[in-house]
Amino acid sequence: MPIMSAQWQEDSKANKQRWFLGHQDAIDFVNCFFDAVELWDDLIDKDVEVLDEHVNRAFLSLMFVLPANRWFVANYNYYQPLIMASINGFHDANEMSKSDKKHLRNLAFHIRNFGIEIHIATAFLIGGFEHMRKVSREIREFYAFEEFENA
């Protein structure tokens, strides 16, 4: 994943406040979880230098912070299938991205973003169906900013 600008980081923070209706435990869950996801991606695709600080932060988060997060604990059964589907999609995408077939590389480009569904599911759990529908397209557009040709 490319290094995101300070402006993008600020926009992300403001967006999460809106998307998740200021629910801090849910925001903390999403931030903690996706910090580890980004590390995993960087370790596999080796497109950026991985700092020891990021490794230490992600492992601390996965072993201590995430299991102690009240939002995650309360919604664990809802998230687990989404997390597993995201992990499976990540592995499939990494394999298909190496294909000599363009349609498989294109598919890989799209399924690697399945984790976005965790953001959308969080919006649903917090605000219900109408709230999810209100923010889901914006969430997709915010995170899916790369084009296939550049992937």
Predicted regions and their residues:
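All-alpha prenyltransferase/terpene-synthase fold signal
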Residues: 1-151
